[in-house]
């Protein structure tokens, strides 16, 4: 999946990420850009407009929770399937989330990182993070196979 150099680069960069801010923005953007994903978050209250979604405290809190899990995965890049096994089971068996949504969220996360870090988020880092989010999406979809 990732070379030792790529792992070092993404891990070092991830230390700069403000998980609470980036998580809320990434989940919010997912819900705005792909509105069908909102059906999994009906208990979150008002998701009727982009502003409502982006300012919703439950979206922000869950986005942080999602990125806290992602951060844990960043510490276990060699065992993403093991790291995300319980979450894969939850999302498959109980929540019935379409695994394609994991790919969408990963891609949105990469966009949010680029937006927040500008030139510091180089094309090489973007390519490395695309590998990471693909690996995480695959690990989360593992239970579906």
Curated annotation (Swiss-Prot):
InterPro entries reported in the protein's UniProt record: Globin (IPR000971), Globin-like_sf (IPR009050), Globin/Proto (IPR012292), Hemoglobin_b (IPR002337), Hemoglobin_oxygen_transport (IPR050056)
Molecular function GO labels: heme binding; hemoglobin alpha binding; metal ion binding; oxygen binding; oxygen carrier activity
Entry-annotated residues carrying S-nitrosocysteine: 92
Record's keyword terms, sorted: Acetylation, Heme, Iron, Metal-binding, Oxygen transport, Phosphoprotein, S-nitrosylation, Transport
Residues given in the record as heme b binding sites: 62, 91
Residues modified to Phosphoserine: 43
GO CC term (a single one): hemoglobin complex
Organs and tissues of expression: Red blood cells.
Domain Globin, first and last residues per copy: 1-145
Residues modified to N6-acetyllysine: 58, 81
GO BP terms: cellular oxidant detoxification; hydrogen peroxide catabolic process
CDD domains referenced in this protein's UniProt entry, alphabetically: Hb-beta-like
PTM sites of type Phosphothreonine: 11
Similarity-based family: Belongs to the globin family.
Quaternary structure, from the entry: Heterotetramer of two alpha chains and two beta chains.
PANTHER family: HEMOGLOBIN FAMILY MEMBER, HEMOGLOBIN SUBUNIT BETA
Function noted in UniProt: Involved in oxygen transport from the lung to the various peripheral tissues.
Name of the molecule in the record: Hemoglobin subunit beta
């Amino acid at each position: 999946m990732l070379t030792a150099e790529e792992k070092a680069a993404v891990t070092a960069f991830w230390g700069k990420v403000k998980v609470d801010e980036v998580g809320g923005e990434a989940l919010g953007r997912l819900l705005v850009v792909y509105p069908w994903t909102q059906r999994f978050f009906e208990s979150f209250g008002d998701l009727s407009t982009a502003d409502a979604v982006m300012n919703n405290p439950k979206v922000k809190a869950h986005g942080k929770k999602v990125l806290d899990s992602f951060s844990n995965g960043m510490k276990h890049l060699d065992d993403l399937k093991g790291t995300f096994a319980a979450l894969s089971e939850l999302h498959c068996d109980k929540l019935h989330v379409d695994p394609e949504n994991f790919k969408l969220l990963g891609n949105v996360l990469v966009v949010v990182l680029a937006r927040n870090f500008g030139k510091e988020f180089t094309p090489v880092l973007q390519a490395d993070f695309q590998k990471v989010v693909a690996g995480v999406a695959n690990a989360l979809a593992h239970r579906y196979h």
